[in-house]
Curated annotation (Swiss-Prot):
Assembly notes: Component of the ClpX-ClpP complex. Forms a hexameric ring that, in the presence of ATP, binds to fourteen ClpP subunits assembled into a disk-like structure with a central cavity, resembling the structure of eukaryotic proteasomes.
Keyword Cytoplasm: no
Native source organism of the sequence: Shewanella frigidimarina (strain NCIMB 400)
Domain ClpX-type ZB residue range list: 4-57
CDD domains: RecA-like_ClpX (cd19497)
GO biological process: cell division; proteolysis involved in protein catabolic process
Identification of the protein by name: ATP-dependent Clp protease ATP-binding subunit ClpX
Gene name for this UniProt entry: clpX
Family: Belongs to the ClpX chaperone family.
Coiled-coil residue spans: none
Gene Ontology molecular function, alphabetical: ATP binding; ATP hydrolysis activity; ATP-dependent protein folding chaperone; protein dimerization activity; unfolded protein binding; zinc ion binding
Record-listed Zn(2+) binding positions: 16, 19, 38, 41
Binding annotation for ATP: 121-128
Keyword vocabulary terms for this entry: ATP-binding, Chaperone, Metal-binding, Nucleotide-binding, Zinc
């Protein structure tokens, strides 16, 4: 085989044996025994093969449905703690995909959707749990922010845009999208502004809940192809949302007060009051674990919306020890990610134990949970990552407690075993 663009030997004009284009109309013409193929036909063949592989792969994936134990084990590899939430999620997700495989109706019994509501403070791992589950099942995953959603016809994001995001993740393959997972964050922010139904239109609160009802329960959503705007003459992609798993999450700040009020009704004041000391006070996570549908209604979610989210899991606040584990133990731990970046420069990165403790303490003081860890580590290593590509002979960088506290720069170790501070001390 060989490349032919100009046939200088014979002066004969060559043509692609497949599309008939001449050598002057294409970039490359590949020659075989009395046969020629152009680069455009090669690209077309590659596209056809890729499409066929894409059609076969979902069928292969459906053959293997991980058990709840296997799903939990996969979550353990990437998410620290939250044992109860992992168990609840593993069972709900397993049941959902079992329902898809075997049909929604079994022996005349209609199987309901097991959509999930996650309650937990900021940075406790709600998004990561949903993302990790989608990755372990090899299904499309899309995330939406409930605060940007409004009812159709108002300024803001239409709820059907959520399905559009899911389609984008799988190249507008409807069949694949219908097996996907959608995570809607900040769901507590669309709560009704008061307990009583309002006479005015609440387009970003109760209105969004009403708009999400059908989508979460199951409807055929009409989505413009390739993300275009809707217009009457357009053909829409029809997506059956009854097969999509919806996971909604939120911090639900203040919900614990609603639960406490219900739990202690009639015993809060007077001579008959139950006196509790500081040691008897339950944590917010312990209180949230006692949540009932009535509490969520009082918080501002409408009963119909709560009914569409039958599985409720509560995540606990992360303490300092958990944050230290998150920094170093998961498969994609932050310290491992930054070590991999430094390895690309042939530099070893070491975080000492006191540095990990100091980073965790800083995140605790900021009250951002695990979400704030990356920004702390990034700021610590910024100058070092800026200098190292231009600095010769560095083989190791060491981060200790003093670096995290801003008292010194990371220690750089050079090939000649001379140790210097990253501040450029020569």
């Amino acid at each position: 085989m060989g490349d032919n663009k100009n046939n200088g030997d014979s002066g004969k004009l060559l043509y692609c044996s497949f599309c008939g284009k001449s050598q002057h109309e294409v970039r490359k013409l590949i020659a075989g025994p009395s046969v020629y193929v152009c680069d455009e036909c090669v690209d077309l063949c590659n596209d056809i093969i890729r499409e066929e592989i894409k059609e076969i792969s979902p069928k292969r994936d459906e053959d293997k449905l991980p058990t709840p134990h296997e799903l939990r084990k996969h979550l353990d590899d990437y998410v620290i703690g939250q044992d109860q939430a992992k168990k609840v999620l593993a069972v709900a997700v397993y049941n959902h995909y079992k329902r898809l495989r075997n049909g929604a109706i079994k022996d005349g019994v209609e199987l309901g959707k097991s959509n999930i509501l996650l309650l937990g403070p900021t940075g406790s791992g709600k998004t990561l749990l949903a993302e990790t589950l989608a990755r372990s099942l090899n299904v499309p995953f899309a995330m939406a922010d409930a605060t940007t959603l409004t009812e159709a016809g108002y300024v803001g994001e239409d709820v059907e845009n959520i399905i559009q995001k899911l389609l984008q993740k799988c190249d507008y393959d409807v069949e694949k999208a219908e097996r996907g997972i959608v995570y809607i964050d900040e769901i507590d922010k669309i709560s009704r502004k008061s307990d009583n139904p309002s006479i005015t239109r609440d387009v970003s609160g109760e209105g969004v809940q009403q708009a999400l009802l059908k989508l979460i329960e199951g409807t055929v959503a009409s989505v413009p192809p390739q993300g275009g705007r809707k217009h009457p003459q357009q053909e829409f992609l029809q997506v059956d949302t009854s097969k999509i798993l919806f996971i909604c999450g939120g911090a639900f700040a203040g919900l614990e007060k609603v639960i406490e009020q219900r739990a202690h009704t009639g015993t809060g004041i007077g001579f008959g009051a139950e006196v509790k000391g500081e040691a008897d006070k339950a944590t917010i996570s312990q209180i949230l674990s006692q949540v009932e549908p009535g509490d969520l209604v009082k918080f501002g979610l409408i009963p119909e919306f709560i009914g569409r989210l039958p599985v409720v899991a509560t995540l606990t606040e992360l303490d300092e020890a958990a944050l230290v584990q998150i920094l170093s133990e998961p498969k994609n731990a932050l310290t491992k990610q930054y070590s991999a970046l430094f390895e690309m420069e042939d530099v070893e990165l070491e975080f000492r134990d006191d540095a990990l403790q100091a980073i965790a303490q800083k995140a605790m003081s900021r009250k951002t949970g695990a979400r704030g860890l990356r920004s702390i580590v990034e700021s610590i290593l910024l100058d070092t990552m800026y200098d190292i590509p231009s600095t010769q002979g560095v083989i190791k960088a060491v981060v200790d407690e003093s670096v995290v506290k801003g008292e010194s720069a990371p220690i750089l170790i050079y090939e000649n075993t001379e140790t210097q501070a990253a501040s450029g001390e020569q």
